[in-house]
Amino acid sequence: LYELREKMDAEYFNIHDGADEDEITILSQSAWYGGILRAVEGEAEPFYASWQAFGNLNPEDPDFWNQADRHFDLTWYTDYIIGESWMSNIDWPWNNIKIYRSDVTGNRWRYCLIDQELALQPNGWTDVYYDHIRFMLDQDPSIPHISVWLKGMQNNRFRNYFINRFADLMNSNYLFEHISAIEQNMFALTRDEMVNEYSRWGDPNNIPEQMMAFTGNHLTLQQQFQMRTEQVRNHIVSNLGLPNQVNLSLNVVPEGAGKIHISTITPDTYPWNGVYFNGVPVSITAEPAPGYYFSYWGNNGLIADTLNVQFLDTLNAETIDFTAYFGEEHVGTGQIAAGEDGFSLYPNPAGDVIYLSNLKHKEAVYTLYDMNGHLLKEGIIRETDTQTVINISNLTPSVYLMRVMDPTDGPVHLRFIKAADLH
């Protein structure tokens, strides 16, 4: 058995984190040392003080995340738990523990993912079908390294973050084409040396059969990687009481005009497809590229306000599409022409007031947004008013979007500049 691993010592965290070696604490817990949490660098007592303080927290407290995050880096810890669970590692959490903190972590504890050789097949204690979510839920809360997760799952913010972050990683870093390419490269680098390995340490008279077994192990592991995510998604739904998985697609129009940030990731190419979970709120935000502005979301039956740059709600669907429409920035001066829309804004740039002209002589509703989609002002345009005066003296100098909702012809979008000083 050969293992290739990083040596996570003070020098490692100094090089990779820029941590001061005199400010680093490293703790380890291993069955080889009696299963006792021992100090490799520094002392172990501060960890137990942090764990005790965490144990006194109330998961129903709205400030639970912030209080817990002072002791344990929760975003880091969540990724650590997800890694252990996706790999289906059960030689843990009483074994194979490495924890550190430093001046760089704000003296918050971070866990390191190590020793996964007994996870999944061909030689692990579990396989692709193993329900690791259930395994974690059944753990003893007196074990510090899982107790943070067990208590965290009683808090809505932590629980929602864990579920959405797990979905994010399965839609990105844990995609089969990504993770299998890493394993394939390591296999290719090792394969050429295995003939000499078996010749010296194996059976030199039966090298072809040993090479066949070596390749077979590689193919089995690849198959495990390919099938794992589907099983994990099923386990998340069944164990955490979620209604269903949601097949989600993201798209931007026109191409290259922006991106869409979903939960904790921002895909680079569109259309983009992923799987999320009904039952937890998901944040989806349109992000315009330089030279563009967010215009609106395509109607998908879930978005209540298609002009708001951010959607934050549950994905109550089985299949859903989010398409963000962007416009190109061409904000000029003078009057914004009404054209066939029948509405116009002037002057542009504007000072303390701007005038909304109603050439249609129809009643309508206007809403004013900043370029991040935040609603700033709204009002009614009366049928008899050919001109509506809108006070914008409280707005900071910037570009703004006016939406006029015509009940018969639909929305009209106008943009204007609030000038810094027109005097």
What are these regions (language model features)?
Residues 238-247, 325-346, 420-423:
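Residue-level detector of functionally pivotal "anchor" positions at catalytic/ligand-binding pockets or at interdomain
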Residues 244, 307-330:
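Conserved "repeat-terminator" motif of extracellular CCP/Sushi domains
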Residues 198, 202, 281-307:
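Surface-exposed interfaces of beta-sheet-rich extracellular modules
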Residues 336-346, 350-423:
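C-terminal outer-membrane/trafficking sorting elements
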Residues 1-42:
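Conserved ATP-binding subdomain of kinase catalytic cores across diverse folds
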Residues 246-254, 258-260, 324:
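A short, amphipathic beta-strand motif
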Residues 1, 13, 45-249:
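Middle-to-C-terminal accessory/interaction subdomains
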Residues 263-291, 316:
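Extracellular modular ligand-binding repeats in secreted and cell-surface proteins
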